Design a protein with these regions (language model features):
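Beta1/beta-strand and adjacent pyrophosphate-binding region of the FAD-binding site
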Residues: 16-30, 47
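A short, basic/flexible loop-to-alpha-helix module at the beginning of a structural domain
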Residues: 6-20
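Glycine-rich FAD pyrophosphate-binding loop
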Residues: 39-59
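Helical element adjacent to the flavin cofactor pocket in flavoenzyme catalytic cores
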Residues: 157-198
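Dinucleotide-binding Rossmann-like beta1-alpha1 core, especially the glycine-rich loop
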Residues: 64-142
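Gly/Ala-rich phosphate-binding loop of Rossmann-like dinucleotide-binding domains
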Residues: 35, 39, 175
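Short loop/edge segments at beta-strand edges and connector loops
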Residues: 50, 135, 185-187
Length: 198
């Protein structure tokens, strides 16, 4: 449990609870996602503290790309989970996240790279990801700017795309609040003191 004495806070302009079960520090997309997932798991005593306003750190200028193709199968599965989650938070929060599914292609200019893409595809299929090995000519139909003569193959991910990181963060925040989470903005944490019992 958090005790008020264990955090030094500055800029506190709102009445805040003095004890809580968990505190998330930082109101970017990751912090708001953590708060959302805690409330989704049933944590009703969870608080997020943001030193300024939500998304005021690096989230507001993030690219917002969505990808499932990754060399690490665990990361690929996490990326797939997150893409599926976006619809959920949009529905719960009522916040449009500006999601655009465009599809994406990874190209192989060498046989070695193409073999690597085949391995990534096989791992992805095992994890339930819907990717497809395609020819350079098929890739050109999707991306007319490429010259198929320079490539030996490609990997297509139909659900790749992009979204608005600002709106996505607010969707997480609104969904978390609807599930009992609390968010305090303009609260700077300047010190943490760990109790001997942890």
């Amino acid at each position: 449990f958090l005790e008020a004495q264990s955090l030094k806070l500055t800029n506190v302009k709102v009445l805040m609870k003095s004890h809580t079960q968990v505190v998330v520090i930082g109101g970017g997309v990751v912090g708001c996602s953590v708060l959302y997932h805690l409330t989704k798991l049933g944590w009703k005593d969870a608080v997020l503290l943001e030193r300024s306003e939500l998304t005021s750190g690096s989230t507001w200028h993030a690219a917002g790309g969505m990808h499932t193709i990754n060399g690490d199968p665990n990361v690929a599965k996490l990326q797939q989970y997150t893409i599926d989650l976006y619809q959920e938070i949009q529905e719960i929060s009522g916040q449009d996240i500006g999601k655009h599914v465009t599809g994406g292609i990874m190209l192989a200019a060498t046989k070695e790279r193409f073999e690597w893409l085949k391995i990534i595809h096989a791992r992805g299929r095992y994890l339930g990801l819907e990717t497809e090995i395609i020819s350079p000519k098929e890739a050109q139909k999707i991306m007319p700017l490429i010259n198929p003569e320079h490539f030996v193959g490609a990997l297509h991910d139909s659900i790749e795309g992009h979204l608005d990181p600002y709106s996505t963060t607010w969707a997480y925040a609104k969904a978390a609040k609807k599930q009992g989470g609390e968010i305090y903005q303009n609260v700077r944490v300047t010190d943490l003191q760990i109790h001997p019992q942890g």
